[in-house]
Amino acid sequence: MSSISQNDLSNLDDGSKKEIMTFLESENSKQKVQMSIHQFTNLCFKNCISNVQNADLSSQEEQCLNNCVNRFLDTNIRIVKGLQSIQ
């Protein structure tokens, strides 16, 4: 895989630079979402699943996971709103 030098970037027109920046921002956003999903999956699995006995979740495990993910999302939304109100 080749790398892009600063010189290569400086040779691009403004439209291409903007397109690359938009692409990078999109990829960065995707990465943040994936990291959040991994984080709450890991946290909720540790909190809700004590013993894996088969491929299916018990009703208690399923309810615990649903509640955990919902609380995680609610908390993140509240934090984002709080940060936005500060700005």
UniProtKB/Swiss-Prot annotation:
It comes from the Eukaryota. Coiled coil: none annotated. Keywords: Chaperone, Disulfide bond, Membrane, Metal-binding, Mitochondrion, Mitochondrion inner membrane, Protein transport, Translocation, Transport, Zinc. A motif (Twin CX3C motif) lies at residues 44-68. GO terms for molecular function: metal ion binding. InterPro entries: Tim10-like, Tim10-like_dom_sf. The keyword Thylakoid does not apply. It is a peripheral membrane protein. One of its GO terms (cellular component) is mitochondrial inner membrane. The keyword Chloroplast does not apply. One of its GO terms (biological process) is protein transport. Disulfide bonds join C44-C68, C48-C64. It is found in: Mitochondrion inner membrane. Mitochondrial intermembrane chaperone that participates in the import and insertion of some multi-pass transmembrane proteins into the mitochondrial inner membrane. Also required for the transfer of beta-barrel precursors from the TOM complex to the sorting and assembly machinery (SAM complex) of the outer membrane. Acts as a chaperone-like protein that protects the hydrophobic precursors from aggregation and guide them through the mitochondrial intermembrane space. The twin CX3C motif contains 4 conserved Cys residues that form 2 disulfide bonds in the mitochondrial intermembrane space. However, during the transit of TIM8 from cytoplasm into mitochondrion, the Cys residues probably coordinate zinc, thereby preventing folding and allowing its transfer across mitochondrial outer membrane. Belongs to the small Tim family. Heterohexamer; composed of 3 copies of TIM8 and 3 copies of TIM13, named soluble 70 kDa complex. Associates with the TIM22 complex, whose core is composed of TIM22 and TIM54. Interacts with the transmembrane regions of multi-pass transmembrane proteins in transit. This is Mitochondrial import inner membrane translocase subunit TIM8. It comes from Kluyveromyces lactis (strain ATCC 8585 / CBS 2359 / DSM 70799 / NBRC 1267 / NRRL Y-1140 / WM37).
